[in-house]
Design a protein with these regions (language model features):
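Proteins with a high burden of low-complexity, intrinsically disordered sequence enriched in S/T/G/P/A and R
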Residues: 9, 55-61, 112-116
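Charged phosphate-binding loop/patch that engages nucleotide di/tri-phosphates or the phosphate backbone
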Residues: 98-116
Length: 116
């Protein structure tokens, strides 16, 4: 599993959709931008989560479309520092439990929906 560490919490790569951009294109682009991983094969939709956050004196509602993705080529991970991502890591299923104690509820929901 490909995880990122942002603001001290483990997370999954994600981001904002550009105007008119297909959700699948957004998913692949954001993973590439946040981790340096390219040439991914998109799998099926896992789930859609919603969460609210407060920024610039405004509450925002964010809908996130989560997809399975596969990769075939080894790649050096490059965390996107300008997005406050301090680490990107491949994590085996057996290594997930301690990391998932330090994440967001929506990420736990994604792993639950993915049957991990």
């Amino acid at each position: 599993y490909l995880l990122i560490k942002r603001n001290g919490l483990w997370d999954l790569p994600k981001g904002h959709r550009e105007k008119g951009e297909d959700f699948t294109v957004t998913a692949l682009r954001e993973v590439r931008e946040e981790t340096g991983v390219d040439n991914l094969e998109l799998g099926g939709l896992i789930c859609i989560t919603d969460h609210c956050y407060y920024r610039d004196d405004i509450w925002h509602l964010k809908h996130i479309w989560w997809y399975d993705m596969l990769y075939n080529e080894p790649v050096d991970l490059v965390p996107q520092k300008e997005e406050d991502i301090t680490k990107a890591a491949w994590v085996a299923k057996s290594g997930l439990p301690p990391l998932l104690k330090n994440t967001f509820p929506s990420i736990l929901e994604v792993f639950h929906e993915a049957k991990v």
